[in-house]
């Protein structure tokens, strides 16, 4: 959980005043952090689009999310504030009330220890430096072990719900335009990742900065779509393709557009690298290609999957959800996702 301190003094004062006014009980400060991260246009409240972008989990349908939003919106303003979030979730915390309180204490303790380490490490003896490194490593191991347990619990509960609903819900596709660039409202992070290359370069299966063959195919698809959108298009007689009954007729092409906050570009690139490496190793992933638009921090990601079921299952994996959660912080606006089925024969011909 991120530190709730803000980079902007005015935001700092606003959060402190809000926290004081609400008299938040121990552990409830997480909802200040949730509001801050989900509030993309920095107006201090969540619209339904912002709420959906943050809370959608691939299980609840759009209608269910809409119903939940209005249940939480007790002020009937079509917006949610921290008071409403706290009021709703505090009724359902159960044992997690103690968990959130412990996380709040843990967050403060770690920040305090890190500050002490930063101040004293350089002047410490070799033995003291060794002990510090050892404690940092073991603390990280313990936290990762807890994270793994939580991720297993998440997967189990979500899979159980999907089985009860007899199949995965269709993911929400968001198309939101925000008024202007989002201001930076997060804590300055330690710059521990420093790729020196100005371009994102990953050497791995299925991922190249410039993949001429598949960029050509993608461009052909884009031109075809552009032609179909023209009103004066003259359609030629279709060329029929006979498909055998046991042949997979289509594959899923997914296009994802992401506008990255400039100051978070390096961390986004690292998260993207980990995501692509994990996704490319999946049996149902045929290929992933990436384009970065020049002179702006905008990425186009093209994913080829065997079918829509495989892609929907991929969305529920830990690595995919981790990437989605990190994008809440890294992106100026929610990503735009579009999908289309293309003939599987196109893939076979080019492989």
Swiss-Prot record:
Keyword Repeat: yes
Post-translational modification Phosphoserine, affected residues: 4, 192, 197
Gene that this sequence comes from: NECAB1
Alphabetical keyword list: Calcium, Coiled coil, Cytoplasm, Metal-binding, Phosphoprotein, Repeat
Record-listed Ca(2+) binding positions: 39, 41, 43, 45, 50
Coiled coil: 135-163, 209-275
Protein name per Swiss-Prot or TrEMBL: N-terminal EF-hand calcium-binding protein 1
TM region(s), chain numbering: none
A cellular component annotation (GO) from this entry: cytoplasm
Main location: cytoplasm
Cell location: Cytoplasm
A GO MF term: identical protein binding
Domain annotation EF-hand: ranges: 26-61, 60-95
Residue span of region Disordered: 180-203
All residue ranges annotated as the ABM domain in the record: 252-340
Annotated InterPro entries: ABM_dom, Dimeric_a/b-barrel, EF-hand-dom_pair, EF_Hand_1_Ca_BS, EF_hand_dom, NECAB1/2/3
Subunit structure: Interacts with STX1. May interact with CPNE6.
Tissue expression remark: Expressed in brain (at protein level).
GO biological process, alphabetically ordered: blastocyst hatching; regulation of amyloid precursor protein biosynthetic process
Compositional bias ranges of the Polar residues kind: 190-202
